[in-house]
A protein has these predicted regions:
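Conserved glycine-rich cofactor-binding loop
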Residues: 11, 18-19
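Active-site loop immediately N-terminal to the catalytic Tyr-X3-Lys motif
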Residues: 103, 150-156, 178-179, 216, ...
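Short C-terminal tail/terminal secondary-structure segment
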Residues: 2-3, 150, 229, 240-257
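Residue(s) in the substrate-gating loop at a strand-loop-helix junction
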Residues: 145
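Active-site helix of classical SDR
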Residues: 125, 161, 169
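Alpha-helical segment proximal to the catalytic Tyr-Lys
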Residues: 130, 174-178, 237
C-alpha cells in the first residue's frame, strides 16, 4: 500500500528552520523522507541543523536567509533549484515577538514585528510560490499562533501579524487553488522552547496559560510534526486555506482547574 504521508522525493525549505519549532519541523520533514534546507539568519545554527539533517540520511544545503531581505530569499531559491532542481514544500516559521503595552509601543517595534512575521511570510510565499506555480505543484505551510484567534496581553503587534498570516494563507489558497499549490497554516498552542522557558516556568503567566490548556501541560515541539507532514503530503491534496490548530484544547476551553 502506498504511504500517502511519505515525503520521499520531495525537497523542502523551512524558513526559520534552525531553532525551536522550526528546527523540529526541519528534522521531522527529513524523517518523513524529504531533503530539507533549514535556513535562518545565523550561520552556526544553519550548520548545526544541516548536520543533523544529514545524520537523518537526507540531503541539504547550508544557506542563511533573512525574510526581511527579498534578495536573500531570491538567492536561497536560486541555490536550492540549482542543487535540487525543484522546491516542493515551503514552511514559513521565521518570527519574532516583542512584549510591551500597546500604548507605549514604539512604532518602530510594530514595524519590526509586522515586517518579519507577516510581510516576511508574504515575501517568501511570493518568491517560492512563483517557482511552485510555474511547476504546477507545491505545498506551503505558514506558522500562525493562538494569537491569530485570541488576545493575550502586551503582544498586540505579534497578534496582528499572526492574524494576518492566517488571512494571507486563505487568500493565497483561493488564488492558487487551481494551479496545483496548496497553502495552509498551523496554529501552535503553548509549546515550551528555549525562548519562552523563562516565561512559562514558575510564573503567574505560565500558570494561567497552563490552566487554560485542558490537557494539563504545555506542548512538546515534536507534537507539531505530524500536522506539518500531513499538510505537506499527498494525504492533504484536497486541503487548502485551512488553519490546523495544535493546542491541547486551548481554543476550545474556558477556564479549567
Amino acid at each position: 500500500m502506498t504511504n500517502i504521508f511519505s515525503l520521499e522525493g520531495k525537497t523542502a525549505i523551512v524558513i526559520g528552520g534552525t531553532s525551536g519549532i522550526g528546527r523540529t519541523l526541519s528534522l521531522g520533514l527529513a524523517d518523513a523522507g524529504a531533503d530539507v534546507i533549514a535556513s535562518s539568519r545565523r550561520q552556526a545554527q544553519v550548520d548545526e541543523t544541516a548536520a543533523e539533517i544529514e545524520r537523518h540520511s537526507r540531503q541539504t544545503l547550508r544557506l542563511c536567509s533573512d525574510v526581511c531581505n527579498r534578495a536573500s530569499l531570491e538567492a536561497l531559491l536560486a541555490a536550492a533549484v540549482q542543487r535540487f532542481a525543484k522546491i516542493d514544500i515551503l514552511i514559513n516559521c521565521a518570527g519574532i515577538i516583542k512584549r510591551t503595552t500597546t500604548l507605549t509601543m514604539p512604532e518602530e517595534e510594530w514595524d519590526d514585528v509586522l515586517d518579519t512575521n507577516l510581510t516576511g511570510t508574504l515575501r517568501s510565499c511570493q518568491i517560492f510560490g512563483k517557482h511552485m506555480l510555474e511547476r504546477g505543484y507545491g505545498r506551503i505551510v505558514n506558522i500562525a499562533s493562538l494569537n491569530s484567534f485570541v488576545a493575550l496581553k502586551d503582544v498586540a503587534a505579534y497578534a496582528a501579524s499572526k492574524s494576518g498570516v492566517v488571512s494571507l494563507a486563505r487568500s493565497l489558497a483561493v488564488e492558487w487553488a487551481k494551479r496545483g499549490v496548496t497553502v495552509n497554516a498551523i496554529a501552535p498552542g503553548v509549546f515550551r522552547t528555549a525562548l519562552n522557558a523563562d516565561l512559562l516556568d514558575n510564573t503567574p503567566r505560565g500558570q494561567e496559560l497552563l490552566m487554560r490548556t485542558p490537557v494539563g501541560r504545555f506542548g512538546k515541539t515534536e507534537e507539531i510534526v505530524g500536522a506539518a507532514v500531513y499538510l505537506c503530503s499527498d494525504a492533504a491534496s484536497f486541503v487548502t486555506g485551512h488553519t490546523l490548530v495544535v493546542d491541547g484544547g486551548f481554543l476550545a476551553s474556558g477556564v479549567n482547574q
